[in-house]
Amino acid sequence: MAWSTGQNLSTPGPFILLGFPGPRSMRIGLFLLFLVMYLLTVVGNLAIISLVGAHRCLQTPMYFFLCNLSFLEIWFTTACVPKTLATFAPRGGVISLAGCATQMYFVFSLGCTEYFLLAVMAYDRYLAICLPLRYGGIMTPGLAMRLALGSWLCGFSAITVPATLIARLSFCGSRVINHFFCDISPWIVLSCTDTQVVELVSFGIAFCVILGSCGITLVSYAYIITTIIKIPSARGRHRAFSTCSSHLTVVLIWYGSTIFLHVRTSVESSLDLTKAITVLNTIVTPVLNPFIYTLRNKDVKEALRRTVKGK
C-alpha cells in the first residue's frame, strides 16, 4: 500500500505493521510463543499483586512498589502484545493513525515510568540496608505513595513533547512500519519531512530519563554494596543481599537490553536489529519479573506457599 503525496498524521489513512515476516511455520511458532509469554506475564503479575494484597507481612513500601511494577508490566505488555499477535493474521497489521499514535504514547510512557520506578525501588533498598534504624521513619506510607505517583506522572509527561512533534510529521510513499508495534524510529524513517527536531528531542528525553534513573540506581547500589561488604558475618551479608537481589536482577536485564537497543549505527540500517532486541523489553522482561521475584524472594515464596496450602 502506498501514498503518492505527503499526509499529516491527522489525515485519515492506516499504517501497516510489518511484524515478523517469514515462513508460515516460523510465524505460527512465534505467535504461540508470544501468546504464552503474554498470558504468563498477566497471570504472574496478577499473582504478585494478589499475594501482596492478601498477606499483611507483604504490605510494606518494598512490596507496594513491586505491585506498581507488576501493574505496569501488565499494562505495558497489553499495550503492545495483542496488536503484535494480530500482525500474524492476514491484514492484522493494519492500524489506524489514531491507534498507532495511542499505542506509541502508552508504550513509551509506560517504559519511562518503569525507569523511574526501578530507581525508586533502588532508593528504597538503599534506605532499608544502609539506614535500617531510620527506614521506618523515612520511608513512610505517604512518601512511598508520593514516590510511586511521581514516577507515573513523570513517565507519562516525558513522552508528551515528542508525541506532539511526531503528530505534526507528514508521510509520503509507503506506510509500512518495519516493526511489531508503533515505534518512533520506523515512523521517522517513513516521514518525508525534516525529522531533526523530533530526533533531537526524543534523544534528549531518552538520555535524561535513562541517565537520571540509572544514576540514582547506580549510586544506591554503590552504597548498598559498600554497606554489605562491611557486614562481618557471611550470614548477615547473605541476608542483606537477599533483600535486593531480585530487584538487582530485574535492573540488570532491563538496562542490559536498553544498552543493546541504543548502541546502533543508524536508524535506517538497524531497524531489524532494533525489532529483535525490543522483544526483550516488551515481551521477555515482563514475563521474567514475576518468576524472579518469586524464586529469589524469601517473603514472596513463603506467602505463595501459605496461599497454596490455604493457610
Swiss-Prot record:
The compartments listed are:
Cell membrane
Listed GO cellular component terms?
plasma membrane
Q: Which residues lie on this side of the membrane: Cytoplasmic?
A: 54-60, 124-142, 223-239, 296-311
Pfam families with a match to the protein in the record: 7tm_4
Q: InterPro entries, alphabetically?
A: GPCR_Rhodpsn (IPR000276), GPCR_Rhodpsn_7TM (IPR017452), Olfact_rcpt (IPR000725), Olfact_rcpt_6C-like (IPR047132)
Q: Where are the transmembrane segments?
A: 28-53, 61-82, 104-123, 143-161, 200-222, 240-263, 276-295
* Glycosylation (residues): 8
Show which residues sit on the Extracellular side of the membrane: 1-27, 83-103, 162-199, 264-275
Q: For this protein, what is any one GO molecular function term?
A: G protein-coupled receptor activity
Its predominant location is membrane
Please give the superkingdom of this protein's source. Eukaryota
Could you tell me in which tissues this protein is expressed?
Olfactory epithelium.
Against SUPFAM superfamilies, the record matches this protein to:
Family A G protein-coupled receptor-like
Topology relative to the membrane, per the entry?
Multi-pass membrane protein
Keywords for the protein's UniProt record, in alphabetical order: Cell membrane, Disulfide bond, G-protein coupled receptor, Glycoprotein, Membrane, Olfaction, Receptor, Sensory transduction, Transducer, Transmembrane, Transmembrane helix
Q: List the disulfide bonds.
A: 100-192
**Role according to the record:** Odorant receptor.
Q: Which family does it belong to?
A: Belongs to the G-protein coupled receptor 1 family.
Q: What is this protein called?
A: Olfactory receptor 287
Q: Which organism is it from?
A: Rattus norvegicus (Rat)
* Taxonomy of the source species: Eukaryota, Metazoa, Chordata, Craniata, Vertebrata
The gene it comes from is: Olr287
